[in-house]
Amino acid sequence: MHPVRLFCWHFMAYPNLPEDFDDNHSSGWVTVPNKLWDREKSRGLYQTYIDQLAYGDELGFDGLVLNEHHQNIYGLMASPNLIASALTQKTEKAKIVVLADLPPLYLNPLRVAEEFAMLDNMSNGRLIAGFAVGGGPESFNYNVPSPHGRRRLWEAIDLVVRSWTDEGPFHHEGPCYPLRYVNIWPKPLQTPHPQVWVPGSRSIESMEEVAKRGYCYFLSSRSHGDGTKAAALEFAQVMEKHNKTYTPFNMGVLLSVYVSESDEQAKAEAEKPVWYFLRNCLKGHLRQKGKSMTFGPGVPSQSLRSWEAFLNAPRSSGRMLGDADSWDELEARNSIIVGSPETVREKLWGFVEQAQVGNLLIQFHFGNMEDKLARKSMRLFAEEVAPALRRDSGNLFDQEFPVLRDLELEEAV
């Protein structure tokens, strides 16, 4: 059987903001004053978050997901590779997914190649290597013109993968990274190299680049419905164009989930940290308020026409996750799934059955959620949601995608 792969994703949000943050600050990104960092309240915060992820390994999640952001309260992982390094020593089975490093921000992508190779060895071959261009905030923070980012990204990915697979030293004469000596030590443990994942937002250009290289496409969206199924169909068509066959494991999605003993208890426990996350952490990212700081012509790769349309659109249109006014609106768009094990299992199965995406990257911790609540949600999910989800999805995928059985036979030979 080939069941869904269930990953635990942690964003490591800053949980110690003043209650009036939304009233007094224009954004949680780029310009958010770092005087709000409370040293004493934040003592041990990284240890708590790392331990939550390590708990995911104990519970049997297939992987643990990290990502890179800069100068914000949404995610405190300026270097996800540091967190990944800690996890290599605290976990045994789960894949460690860095989704993603942002090589366009760096002078030399070989640093990413070397660190990923180290992590693959330190984890005994459990690394999944993610690469991304970065968003508008990163363009501002690192003063990297976003229109150049995509060219830098794909040259960097190709160079990193070649450094893992080709014998060195060799020279690389790329337009962005001309290098006389490419000869990394160590090589990754996995052969030919760790699996590569690349995020995208349904642009055909990104899908094309991912598909022709045979990588996994991660749909970078927090709203799910018909759009996710449409994206999967689009990617399948692009893969077919490149003589490849789509399976659910060629694509991944982000889901946000909270599980408790009943629907009522789940809402009561999750409501405060969820609104903290939406109102504060998404301000300037997935919320119209503050968005102009990190979204504009050329940021990220935004055309002037798209920017004008954004400015002229009525505020009721183009609503993002952080613009939600009510709990009913959140539930209607399937952005955050909150409920009893039965409710969560039913909703996730409906999503998997419709979208037929095999890598589910699940956020369990929101904003300022207490450690004990995040752990309870993870445990209930692992014990009372995951078994049926794996069983039913395995049957579905094997029936709908016979190529999976063929791949299994090839691996056994």
Q: Where would I find each of the regions flagged by the language model?
A:
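N-terminal beta1-alpha1-beta2 module of alpha/beta enzyme domains
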Residues: 1-95, 193-194, 400-404, 412-413
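An alpha-helical appendage that flanks or caps ligand/catalytic pockets
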Residues: 2, 8-37, 150-185, 226-355, ...
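Glycine-rich, proline-tolerant flexible connector loops at the mouths of alpha/beta enzymes
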Residues: 65-83, 102-103, 222-225, 362-374
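A conserved active-site cap/scaffold subdomain adjacent to cofactor or substrate pockets
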Residues: 202-232, 236
